[in-house]
Amino acid sequence: MQIYPLRLLPNKIDFDFMNFKKVSYTFSIILSLISFIWIGIYKFNFGIDFAGGIVIEVRLDQAPDLPKMRGVLGKLGIGEVVLQNFGSERDLSIRFGSSSEENLMKNIELIKASLQSNFPYKFEYRKVDFVGPQVGRQLIEAGAMAMLFSFLAIMVYIWVRFEWYFGLGILIALVHDVILALGFMSMTKLDFNLSTIAAVLTIIGYSVNDSVVIYDRIRENLRKYHKKNITEIINLSINETLSRTILTVITTLLANLALILFGGEAIRSFSVLVFFGIIAGTYSSIFISAPILTMFVNRKFNKKVIER
């Protein structure tokens, strides 16, 4: 039985992506500036991980229904409430932000009363701790270092596999994606917590993967078509990988949409940010990281790239 590959687009596509190079650069610069300005004015909605808050440790007589608990506590109007098991499935950690000292005891009692009235469990409150913003600052620094090291590792990988200007093209695209993702977080008031740091790193990985696929095809076409200029080769390479790019982005977005709809509040910020980042990463791999090579690559420099 013959197996036919799934194709969303015809085999021969000749769309002139490079004709939109200046438009895409201008569009990206405007979006990046808007993101910077918005972040500067409205800041981020820091979650408990970074802003600090209260941690209540509870032991129950049986395993709790966490999704239902999150729904009940989320309606109390005290901001983000994070519930997690630790140790055994009967041990529960409840974290929430502390807006002011006056509301501190009030919110703790509100949570206790809500749990008692809505659930048939026996609650043993073992510890109540305050987590200060100093811990949050340390986590922010650790997250920033994680992103920095990921940038450096990617640069080295691309440099070894291709050439330095390929790495520079990907770096510019990644900075673009991260700026837009952070701007999107600020505009939509998504909670800035540890899961969103993981989301940004996921976006970086996805964007790099997309760009490397196109770069590989560019290098292959440099070997095949000696008389074409770099603009023609980049256009050809993007068109040849377009079907794969669209299939990948659709399947990834569908999987991520399931997380947004059914994953619950605990991973909502992660899922929404990754959904946006996949779109931004796909755009940047086609309209930024590939076209930007025309600034660095010409025929006299292509020999080293072709030989790798």
From Swiss-Prot:
GO terms for cellular component: plasma membrane. Keywords: Cell inner membrane, Cell membrane, Membrane, Protein transport, Translocation, Transmembrane, Transmembrane helix, Transport. One of its GO terms (biological process) is protein transport by the Sec complex. It is found in: Cell inner membrane. It is a multi-pass membrane protein. The keyword Transport applies. The chain crosses the membrane at residues 28-48, 140-160, 164-184, 194-214, 246-266, 272-292. The keyword Cell division does not apply. GO terms for molecular function: protein-transporting ATPase activity. Belongs to the SecD/SecF family. SecF subfamily. Forms a complex with SecD. Part of the essential Sec protein translocation apparatus which comprises SecA, SecYEG and auxiliary proteins SecDF-YajC and YidC. Part of the Sec protein translocase complex. Interacts with the SecYEG preprotein conducting channel. SecDF uses the proton motive force (PMF) to complete protein translocation after the ATP-dependent function of SecA. This is Protein translocase subunit SecF. It comes from Rickettsia massiliae (strain Mtu5). The gene is secF.
